[in-house]
Amino acid sequence: MPDPSTYRPAPGSIPVEPGVYRFRDPHGRVIYVGKAKSLRSRLNSYFADLSGLAPRTRQMVMTAAKVEWTVVNTEVEALQLEYNWIKEFDPRFNIRYRDDKSYPVLAVTLNEEFPRLKVYRGPRKKGVRYFGPYSHAWAIRETVDLLTRVFPARTCSAGVFKRHNQIDRPCLLGYIDKCSAPCVGRVSAEQHRQIVLDFCDFLAGKTDRLVRDLERKMTAAAEDLDFERAARLRDDIGALRRALEKQTVVFGDGTDADVVAFADDDLEAAVQVFHVRGGRVRGQRGWIVEKSGEPGESGEGQLVEQFLTQFYGDQAELGSAGDNAGDSGQDEATNPVPRQVLVPCLPDNADELTEWLSQLRGSRVALRVPQRGDKKALFETVQRNAKEALAQHKLKRAGDFTARTAALQSIQDTLGLADAPLRIECIDISHVQGTDVVASLVVFEDGLPRKSDYRHYAIREAAGDGRSDDVASIAEVTRRRFYRHLHDTQHPTELSAEGKSRKFAYPPNLFVVDGGAPQVNAAQAVLDELGISDVAVIGLAKRLEEVWVPSGSDLGPEPIILPRNSEGLYLLQRVRDEAHRFAITYHRSKRSKRMTASALDSVRGLGEHRRKALVTHFGSVARLKEASVEEITAVPGIGVTTARAVLEALGVPQAAPADSGTAAAVIDDDQRRVTG
């Protein structure tokens, strides 16, 4: 482990201006990013007294091998640069406020001719308007089910919409008037879009206008003696009011605000946010984070600053991704940064943080501590939620952590390892009768899957022509994986643009193969060949769940049988089963691509779009084979030269061109079609 004194900057070399700094490990990876009003004061605090640092900060300083800094003009610039660097490098020692679950949102696809309402998780898309997040998907479905009585918008997928359009008959929702059935032409595209826009206005908080419009229409219908329509409008008004009743009014002045509260202990913190729009609570989110314990920083003020920077920076990016100049433009109720942000305390750089938030919003943002009245009462409610979330997390983690610790300790004791296997890697081979032979490698750290480090391998040397050798495949994958590790170790400067290793950053403590003695010995032979002696190798056989060790091991030639109730065996089974699942998924993908391949794939210059157009036009490859050149060129984008190449690939003999002039004309015609 590096000695901090070896990379400590020389006295007087650090500037006193504000700036942003980053620590790098011996491989050049960025492991921590921070900012400071005075770079000299802050960086010196890391090296003055290591024993006085928080454990996490001390570990960071001991892991690092280099520190760099960038001087900026203002603290607002430092705030923005720190956010950008954390986003770019994802340093392992920085707090990252990631949701404790993937919260669903209600997406309205305004970029489609007939917009659709749907539950959605994932990155924001241009031309789509989002509402939420909601705590559960069923809450979205319940809201949509209630409001489609008043706003009968489309909720079906593209396939269902197309099918009912073809049979000219609406679905059940169309028959019960919960969909305006644009698929069969009951309403025009413009009428349906207006229904969807009214739906969006209601969710955005513009409720009074919509209710008044319905009341006016109900009165007019009653005056015209159209009592059936008046009764329906009365029921619609009741449905809207029931929806409003579910959103309790917390601020009588119709305020837009986010209320943020924390609960923390020495190691972790829980944060809860209530999103209030138009005076009503529209959503709630929660996070659990590990505290950094950065020197010279107050606890809660630091949490407030880091959370607001990361959360609203991310939200502004999502908002711009989903923004569109047309129908999906942001309004007051959907702007990711509200007019007010209520927090438990103001950070030291509150003025700079407020200025940055105002820039994100496009207008003034108020950062305040609630003191009395409704805002204080709601803040206390949010704080109770944060305390409850932290208590539940600690209770759950205590059970999970105890089990994982017991599992790792069991494996260490059973195999006689010097340390607990904090990083476990497992490989598995998958094929069907020697075809599409692939391998998977999965990684578990601290007993939990680390999916960002998972890898697929297509077997090159140990398979082919319908043959497969599992033992040779294990050896090939082991060699490829650890050759990369040796390459990274010998060339530590070869990093990606983000400062990360291009492949694997760290070797495993334990390498698991799916199989028995032959597979284990094959993997061990590769490690011996490469000169790697600090990685333990075992095999886990499915029969009796035996744990095999390499020949010549001090543990003896016989397999080890772990107790059936052993936490260590349970962890090894989960690792092995995850590797098998990952390999099967990749194998099925490769096999599906191979089985769906056709003779058209070999036609030079014929891409997927035009292949699909040909098959769609003729109905099948067999019918395409019977077509003439003239019939094929009737398909948009297909010229004479391409048509001849298609027929040649399908085995249809072609007559040679009559002369060079004709050939030139054909080529010219084909070029005109492609460029057109």
From Swiss-Prot:
Location relative to the cell: Cytoplasm
GIY-YIG domain: residues covered: 16-95
A single GO BP: nucleotide-excision repair
GO cellular component: cytoplasm; excinuclease repair complex
Domain UVR positions: 208-243
Keyword DNA repair assigned: yes
Keyword Nucleotide-binding tagged: no
Pfam family, one: GIY-YIG
Listed PROSITE patterns: GIY_YIG (PS50164), UVR (PS50151), UVRC (PS50165)
Predominant location category: cytoplasm
GO MF terms held by the record: DNA binding; excinuclease ABC activity
Sorted UniProt keywords: Cytoplasm, DNA damage, DNA excision, DNA repair, Excision nuclease, SOS response
Similarity comment: family membership: Belongs to the UvrC family.
PANTHER family, sorted: UVRABC SYSTEM PROTEIN C (PTHR30562:SF1), UVRC/OXIDOREDUCTASE (PTHR30562)
Entries under HAMAP family matching the protein: UvrC
Function: The UvrABC repair system catalyzes the recognition and processing of DNA lesions. UvrC both incises the 5' and 3' sides of the lesion. The N-terminal half is responsible for the 3' incision and the C-terminal half is responsible for the 5' incision.
Subunit description: Interacts with UvrB in an incision complex.
Protein name: UvrABC system protein C
Organism: Mycobacterium sp. (strain JLS)
Gene name of the record: uvrC
